[in-house]
Amino acid sequence: MSRYRGPRFKKIRRLGALPGLTSKSPKAGSDLRNQLRSGKRSQYRIRLEEKQKLRFHYGLTERQLLKYVRIAGKAKGSTGQVLLQLLEMRLDNILFRLGMASTIPGARQLVNHRHILVNGRIVDIPSYRCKPRDIITTRDEQKSRALIQNYLDSSSHEELPKHLTLHSFQYKGLVNQIIDSKWVGLQINELLVVEYYSRQT
């Protein structure tokens, strides 16, 4: 299944706020109307929708998300918590959380077009897994800095998660540590996502 490129508002109306996909929010009461319209949801549908929230927020294909679930399942600790850490530490998501891009698709475009450096080297792989002490900067070119400045000027200036530091005048972000689960940028029940995949195998 390919990455979603359809109408974004249609997705948030059904699944709720997806800040990584779009800065728009569903209208008040739309979740309740959806529930009334669809009647009682089955447990399968509840797990499916939670999985879809995760997939659309982080902009992943079905195959990519399944790969992350399998990696998380082999790691020590809670599979759900490890899964969220893996997704949150992706380079495209780190740029989004720093405010250097307004959405994760926008961050992915910056990376693909080679505007971003990690530790002084160009990285053009959005899924690059950031590590503590990584330094994320833009290229010195005027176009690269203008793009980032535009995003920084229009960002909502929300409190940064504790694992990140932004030096906006230097167009630089620092990864201080692996993210703590309470700073994940999406309201999600990750256990339902893990359950969804465990029942598919």
Curated annotation (Swiss-Prot):
Record flagged with keyword Lipoprotein: no
A GO term, aspect molecular function: structural constituent of ribosome
GO cellular component: chloroplast; small ribosomal subunit
Alphabetical list of SUPFAM superfamilies matching this protein: Alpha-L RNA-binding motif
Region (Disordered): 19-38
SMART domains for the chain: Ribosomal_S4 (SM01390), S4 (SM00363)
Gene Ontology terms: biological process: ribosomal small subunit biogenesis; translation
Entries under InterPro entries matching the protein: Ribosomal_uS4, Ribosomal_uS4_bac-type, Ribosomal_uS4_CS, Ribosomal_uS4_N, S4_RNA-bd, S4_RNA-bd_sf
Annotated ranges, domain S4 RNA-binding: 89-149
Cell compartments where the protein resides: Plastid, Chloroplast
Swiss-Prot/TrEMBL keywords: Chloroplast, Plastid, Ribonucleoprotein, Ribosomal protein, RNA-binding, rRNA-binding
Highest taxon, organism lineage: Eukaryota
Role played: One of the primary rRNA binding proteins, it binds directly to 16S rRNA where it nucleates assembly of the body of the 30S subunit.
Known partners and oligomeric status: Part of the 30S ribosomal subunit. Contacts protein S5. The interaction surface between S4 and S5 is involved in control of translational fidelity.
Alphabetical list of NCBIfam families matching this protein: PRK05327.1, rpsD_bact
Similarity comment: Belongs to the universal ribosomal protein uS4 family.
Protein name according to UniProt: Small ribosomal subunit protein uS4c
Classification of source organism: Eukaryota, Viridiplantae, Streptophyta, Embryophyta, Tracheophyta
Gene from which the chain derives: rps4
